[in-house]
Amino acid sequence: MTEDQARRSGGVGRRRFGARRKVCMFCADQIRVVDYKDVKRLQRCMSERGKILPRRRTGVCARHQRSLTVAIKRARHMALLPFVAAHIRS
């Protein structure tokens, strides 16, 4: 493969198709409402620093992302989740 052909095709050994679309974990488990008490599931949608991850990182659908945000904020208010990470506080 010449250098010009490699550049046009995206390089040597590149995948022909894009990355696979992520499936919403709440839709896959048929969960209608995100529960603020389900801390393990909420932590999967948060960064190490305690920030809420965007949809493009988690693969959650728009409906569940809105309810996920509310659930995380409720869990923070009830002291089930931290507002910031422990290493940042000290």
Curated annotation (Swiss-Prot):
Keywords noted in UniProt: Ribonucleoprotein, Ribosomal protein, RNA-binding, rRNA-binding
SUPFAM superfamilies cross-referenced by the UniProt entry: Ribosomal protein S18
GO cellular component annotations of the record: cytosolic small ribosomal subunit
Molecular function GO labels: small ribosomal subunit rRNA binding; structural constituent of ribosome
GO biological-process terms attached to the record: translation
Any one Pfam family match given in the protein's UniProt record, by short name: Ribosomal_S18
The organism's place on the tree of life at top rank: Bacteria
UniProt family annotation: Belongs to the bacterial ribosomal protein bS18 family.
Quaternary structure and partners: Part of the 30S ribosomal subunit. Forms a tight heterodimer with protein bS6.
Function: Binds as a heterodimer with protein bS6 to the central domain of the 16S rRNA, where it helps stabilize the platform of the 30S subunit.
Protein name as it appears in the record: Small ribosomal subunit protein bS18B
Organism listed in the record: Roseiflexus sp. (strain RS-1)
High-level lineage: Bacteria, Bacillati, Chloroflexota, Chloroflexia, Chloroflexales
Gene: rpsR2
